[in-house]
Amino acid sequence: MTDLPAELERVHMVGIGGAGMSGIARILLARGGQVSGSDAKESRGVLALRARGAQVRIGHDAGALDLLPGGPTVVVTTHAAIPKDNPELVEAARRGIPVILRPAVLASLMQGHRTLLVSGTHGKTSTTSMLVVALQHCGFDPSFAVGGELNEAGTNAHHGSGDVFVAEADESDGSLLQYEPDVVVVTNVEADHLDYFGSTEAYIQVFDDFAARLSPGGLLVACLDDPGSAALAQRVAARGLPGVRVLGYGSAEDADGAFASVDGVEVGARLLSFEARDVGGVLQFQLAGEQSPRTVRMGVPGRHMALNALAALLAAREAGADVDEILEGIAGFGGVHRRFQFTGREHGVRVFDDYAHHPTEVRAVLGAAADLVRQPHEADRRESEDSVRSGKVIVVFQPHLYSRTATFAEEFGHALDLADEVVVLDVYGAREEPLPGVSGALVALSVSKPVHYQPDLSQAPRQVAALASPGDVVITMGAGDVTMLGNQILDALRAAPHHHPSR
């Protein structure tokens, strides 16, 4: 007996090891479904799914559709990662098996729940994860589907016993318009995924259309510090959708400093200050209707994370959670896999890894890194006060997608200028074919700080180790295989313990 509609009782997933697909598979298995799938390579995610009962084949061929007795009732795929000539999709068409996209499955799994969906150009995964952790701390057991692994839970999805479903709503292909949300969080809105949408206007419109899908009595939570999401909030408030409320958060004030509203949008939470402390910080803010500010110690760095915390707070409160307990949960939030994740420390050099692959994300992460380098590791304080004061930020940046690199090369260069030293790798093409004249060198040309273009990924760890000194912070950055370099950089630092370049 399953807790699933008939069409989802036997599901085959093409690309099952991906972050989004593996999460859906976990929920299907937990609800009694039979799941098979294929992926290009073995991974930790694939092994975890096998342990839960999924039948997974490495490589793609038509025979994968026979992994489940009786074959699948439906085949699930994604727009971006799986080509239409994939042999499993071709075989599904030949057999007359329906092929649907991942968001359609997620929308079906959400039915019967109160849905809290987090959208925006950046910050979706971190905000969604923070919201989940806060609700769990408050005694809720929400179902959730997130684009990255929560450090606390070690998973990206869960079938909960409660009536709340929290999910990251991906706008990259417009698929978020399949959802029917009760609460929508919008962290920011600015041009991205233009290879799919074709224009900035079309990209922005998808957020308006998403907000219009809010249920009567629903809530839109939008960041007022971001021009794009603030404008969205103003449009939705002016439109007067039936029963839909709009709450803003951020540090922005109207002309007379009033708390009640900014440009017609009610302010639910105002950020008063964020002070970096060690690898986190202290957030001071005020909630609407309260006379006194509140303070919470956060375990993740960066002002952007402080804003994400306010978004999670307002959404969790709307779900019925207690504010004090929400803040305790936020204080205990340890981050998400590949979101300013600590890799290790060697000879006074701290190495972090981050998924940032858009200029705005790069700026936010490097801003947090600059705060961090001014808050040195306790061991560095003991070893040398001089080295602590002279620490610098070194970023190893791998551009993601040729189309995005061509569009944003100059903006990437300006964003990377927030680091003290920059190593630019070649483009990680993922699903795209190379474009003439587009490479990492295009980004490096726009960097005004000391920059090194390194097209050979294998040479980067030794190069970075030669640049680094005690007190420095190194960040490997990008959505591709740059993530593998963190431990290799630590190995290179161990191999050259006495080499510290002059500043």
Swiss-Prot record:
GO terms for cellular component: cytoplasm. This is UDP-N-acetylmuramate--L-alanine ligase. It catalyses: UDP-N-acetyl-alpha-D-muramate + L-alanine + ATP = UDP-N-acetyl-alpha-D-muramoyl-L-alanine + ADP + phosphate + H(+). GO terms for biological process: cell division; cell wall organization; peptidoglycan biosynthetic process; regulation of cell shape. The gene is murC. The keyword Ligase applies. Pathway: Cell wall biogenesis; peptidoglycan biosynthesis. Its main location: cytoplasm.
